[in-house]
Regions:
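C-terminal region/appendage detector
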Residues: 1-257
Length: 257
């Protein structure tokens, strides 16, 4: 019996791995490596969660703006992911997502890692917006059964996929299962920009955290939210501090390491 094909959703912030037929990823981890300063040990993917003190971590990401720039780092992360899900790469095929704007040179580098380093039997390359458009089309038709093909046949619907990533936001129109490349728009605004803004706020007002991106990212995930009523939330926060003894509904404390 042939091994189930592996599905590799390779994002700039996280990497998600599973198998065809799964309704959710079997393994999700940060798509980066990190090394504590003045130490030789390198933490790969989810190993970052194993340390309590996130201060002074030097983070290396294999993707910048959704484009592969460090193949060696990416190989180490993928190897960790495949081991965690029990994927026998020499006996399996793989479907990997990529940026809709990925140049041919980057696609070639990705293939070299998959075939030369991991020795996969075959590879299916899929632009991430197409996966989203296909999933929406299947849900609209009431097809919630996994494993019935990646793209539904005879897609006639038009979709607009907005991908808000780590370092950029890409807007892709998809018609009949194909991206309209002339209509693709990209802006360099993503989660990383918000983390940088939070870093500036904290550094200017409280404590210099210009080199503590990992801590700030964790702080952002735990304490920040997208306001549905901005005016009301700002009014609720106005003048309510712990020192005045009148902490508002959004007041929170976070202890730095």
């Amino acid at each position: 019996m042939d091994a189930l094909p592996c599905v590799l959703d390779n994002g700039s912030y996280e990497v998600r791995v599973g198998f065809c037929g799964d309704t959710s990823p079997r393994f999700v981890a940060p798509n980066c490596t990190a090394r504590p300063r003045q130490q030789l040990r390198v933490l790969v993917a989810d190993e970052i969660h194993s340390i309590k003190n996130l201060a002074q971590l030097e983070v290396t990401r294999p993707l910048e703006h959704g484009i592969l720039v460090n193949a060696g780092c990416q190989k180490d992360i993928w190897e960790r992911c495949f081991d965690e899900v029990g994927c026998e790469t020499r006996e399996s095929k793989v479907m990997v997502t990529e940026s809709v704007l990925a140049p041919p040179s980057v696609q070639q580098t990705t293939d070299e890692v998959l075939f030369e380093d991991f020795e996969f039997l075959g590879r299916c390359r899929m632009a991430a917006p197409l996966c989203v458009a296909a999933a929406v089309a299947q849900l609209d038709r009431g097809n919630r059964t996994p494993g019935e093909g990646i793209l539904p046949r005879n897609i006639e619907e038009a979709s607009l996929v907005v991908d808000c990533g780590l370092a950029a936001t890409t807007i892709t129109p998809v018609v009949a299962g194909s991206p309209i490349r002339s209509g693709i728009r990209r802006i360099d605004i993503g989660g990383q920009l918000l983390t940088g803004y939070l870093r500036d706020l904290v550094s200017y007002r409280q404590y210099n955290m210009s080199n503590e991106c990992v801590i700030l990212d964790k702080l952002k995930k735990h304490l920040c939210f997208v306001s549905q009523e901005p005016k009301e939330d700002l009014t609720a926060c106005d003048g309510t501090t712990h020192e005045r003894g009148a902490a508002g509904p959004h007041y929170a404390e976070y202890v730095l390491p």
